[in-house]
C-alpha cells in the first residue's frame, strides 16, 4: 500500500481520526473502522512515549499510518515520534518561515533536514532494513 504522503500527493481523499486519550483499544477500533490514518495528539493529550509507542505498534498491525501532533515543534520529541514509526508529524504554533524550516529540518534526514539517523528503531524495523533503503523511504514518505 502506498504511504500516506504518496496517497495525499495523488489527491486521494483521506479520512482520519483524532485520538487525545491513551487507549490501545481505541487505536485498534479506529484502525478496524477503516480510517485512513490516526492522528495522536501529544500536545494536548496525556500520551507519553510508552503509550505512544504502543499506539503506533497497534496501528501498524492493521496497516494504518499514524501522524503525531507534537508540541511547539520540539526537536527531541519529533525524533522520538518518527523513530517509533509515525509516518508524519503535525506541529502547531509555527509563526514564521524559520519555524517551518526548523520543523522540516528536525523531521527529515539529510540532505533535506538534519534528523539523527538510527535504523535500530521501530521505524528501521529494528535494524533489519538496509540503511540506504531506510533513509530513502523516510525521505520520500515522511509527512510534515
Task: Give the positions of each predicted feature.
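Glycine-rich, proline-tolerant flexible connector loops at the mouths of alpha/beta enzymes
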Residues: 26-54
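Alpha-helix-loop-beta-strand connector modules within alpha/beta enzyme cores
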Residues: 49-83, 105-113, 137-140
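Conserved anion-binding
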Residues: 76, 88-144
Amino acid at each position: 500500500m502506498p504511504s500516506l504522503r504518496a496517497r495525499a500527493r495523488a489527491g486521494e481523499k483521506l479520512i482520519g481520526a483524532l485520538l487525545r486519550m491513551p487507549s490501545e483499544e481505541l487505536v485498534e477500533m479506529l484502525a478496524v473502522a477503516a480510517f485512513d490514518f490516526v492522528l495522536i495528539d501529544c500536545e494536548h493529550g496525556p500520551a507519553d512515549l510508552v503509550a505512544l509507542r504502543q499506539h503506533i505498534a497497534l496501528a501498524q498491525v492493521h496497516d494504518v499510518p499514524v501522524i503525531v501532533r507534537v508540541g511547539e515543534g520540539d526537536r527531541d520529541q519529533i525524533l522520538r515520534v518518527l523513530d517509533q514509526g509515525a509516518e508524519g508529524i503535525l506541529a502547531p504554533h509555527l509563526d514564521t518561515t524559520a519555524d517551518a524550516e526548523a520543523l522540516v529540518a528536525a523531521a527529515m534526514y539529510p540532505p533535506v533536514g538534519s534528523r539523527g539517523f538510527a535504523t535500530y528503531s521501530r521505524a528501521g524495523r529494528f535494524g533489519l532494513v538496509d540503511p540506504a533503503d531506510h533513509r530513502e523511504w523516510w525521505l520520500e514518505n515522511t509527512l510534515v
